């Protein structure tokens, strides 16, 4: 699996390096088996595409006023967990893929089919925040293709 150095990850996500380092130091973002940790002998840390997307979603949610701990946990629901019809770290093939933060602190990834509205899918549930994963993923993939 391809990984990217810290500078590329920061640039692709629009996350300042100091903010990215803070996410890691405070364990908001933790490296997973698909990432490459630094061995401390001058080797760079390697971020997988999934981790870069988690960082980008975390940064986007932080811009919306969500705290980094909750933002990173919510982003992990998209980047590292799949749903029926959606592989891990990928968008639903049709419609919109939304990351929804619920008032109880949990987060879910939902699909809004092309013929439905968000109110049809959320029904009586209320949301603390909603983030369009498609927008964030497209931005990250475009930036990574330029690196």
For the regions a language model picked out, list residue spans one by one.
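Short helix-start
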Residues: 32-58
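Low-complexity intrinsically disordered segments
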Residues: 76, 81-147
